[in-house]
């Protein structure tokens, strides 16, 4: 009986030795030392790099294709770098020679033609004026001039028509008018609201484009 018990104990010892992994698998080389939390400290260069990691506004571009009920049509492209002014390049054809009011209107709604684009874009609730005036609508962009062939080309640089932010012009509409804009100085009853620029010949909604 004792021989049987001794043999069973020996077999159990052998089974444990065969199945138990070596202690070294559970022990890191530094397990003899107590573990403390690890804290990474950046040097002066790393701290400066972290401060310099600021997300900047990239260059933005947009376009509006002008269409109307007449033969007037055109393309307006807009470019803005970071928070700088917006550059607007205009080319319109089919106009009568001379000056034509050119404005940015409040809405990008053309369901009823250019009439449904609403009034001039005017987030500051001011009266109509010239682009260089302190008191003006943000959408007051003055006049474009058509040559003898009815083609008007212009470049406008303006700080009040950004492509991002709360006053973004994306989704609003450019409108080219029948008459000259009097820039709020004509003394007409409409001078301080529309510049007495007459009917709306063509319009187009501003949309962002790939760079």
From Swiss-Prot:
Disulphide bridges, residue numbers: 114-203
Transit peptide: 1-57
Cofactor section: Cu cation; Zn(2+)
Residues reported in the UniProt entry to bind Zn(2+): 120, 128, 137, 140
Broad class of enzyme this protein falls into: oxidoreductase
Any one cellular-component term (Gene Ontology): chloroplast
Gene Ontology annotations of biological process type: removal of superoxide radicals
Binding site for Cu cation: 103, 105, 120, 177
Reaction it catalyzes: 2 superoxide + 2 H(+) = H2O2 + O2
Keyword Lipoprotein: no
Cofactor remark from the record: Binds 1 copper ion per subunit. Binds 1 zinc ion per subunit.
Keyword Ribosomal protein: no
Xref: SUPFAM superfamilies: Cu,Zn superoxide dismutase-like
MF-aspect GO terms: copper ion binding; superoxide dismutase activity
Matches recorded under PROSITE patterns: SOD_CU_ZN_1, SOD_CU_ZN_2
Cellular compartment(s): Plastid, Chloroplast
Keywords: Antioxidant, Chloroplast, Copper, Disulfide bond, Metal-binding, Oxidoreductase, Plastid, Transit peptide, Zinc
Domain of life per record: Eukaryota
Family, similarity comment: Belongs to the Cu-Zn superoxide dismutase family.
Function: Destroys radicals which are normally produced within the cells and which are toxic to biological systems.
Name of the protein: Superoxide dismutase [Cu-Zn], chloroplastic
Natural source organism: Oryza sativa subsp. japonica (Rice)
